[in-house]
UniProtKB/Swiss-Prot annotation:
The gene is AIM5. Belongs to the MICOS complex subunit Mic12 family. It comes from the Eukaryota. Its main location: mitochondrion. Pfam families: AIM5. The lineage of its organism: Eukaryota, Fungi, Dikarya, Ascomycota, Saccharomycotina. It is found in: Mitochondrion inner membrane. This is MICOS complex subunit MIC12. Component of the mitochondrial contact site and cristae organizing system (MICOS) complex.
Amino acid sequence: MPRLLRYGSFSVVASVLGASYYYYAVASPLYTEAEWHRVSQRTAALIDRRIDIPVPESTTERREYVVRSSKETMKDIWNEQIRSIVDWIYSWSH
């Protein structure tokens, strides 16, 4: 008898938890409007090849890149920070 009662109570608790999960998470608009649900659906569609992966268009415009050493870059960052600190200090005097 205790074994039957234990299995019966486990079944009832599992059924109640399953039903509450279904009605709260799956059947309600909270589930279908959630951001993680949209991401999950989009990921599944990408995997199943139902939608295409967006590819940015390439341009044929010429671009100029300036390559500098990390030493010069650090000096520029340092100077910018010093200038902003000095501006902040002088802003208190006005």
